[in-house]
């Protein structure tokens, strides 16, 4: 079976009603990105950051996968599909996709502020102040914030390099380093944007 690697972005989930940062004139659900999606925001106001992500998680739980999500899942019948998504929702998985790499993390996981390798599933939609890891540090959303390194980038680059077909859906390729993934795809491989 040919290996189909799919890079997805916010555009595939937007039809589900989930807000996207790029389409909101610099505001993200009414917030400046600097106030809710940076390490500095976390240090300044953990309550605000937690509430922001709790609301995003709640919205994601209420959203339904789009036809685009379903089509990508159906392609598993014909290809060895790996989805590399910039999205932090779980709509690909709920549509039936089995092999999804979340480049920027997941709304449905938390991680230790002391040890980022300690990650935990979030049951329900709330992560609160006082929720701690086994080592006693506050849990934060397991999301890559602006200004942070992308831990899954090397894995994603290795996957992109193995593709027989590379498909890009719902992203304008302006968010780095994800936009650079296409550079890892061998020159002779078909790329569809």
Sequence positions of predicted segments:
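Conserved catalytic core of sirtuin-type NAD+-dependent deacylases
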Residues: 1-193
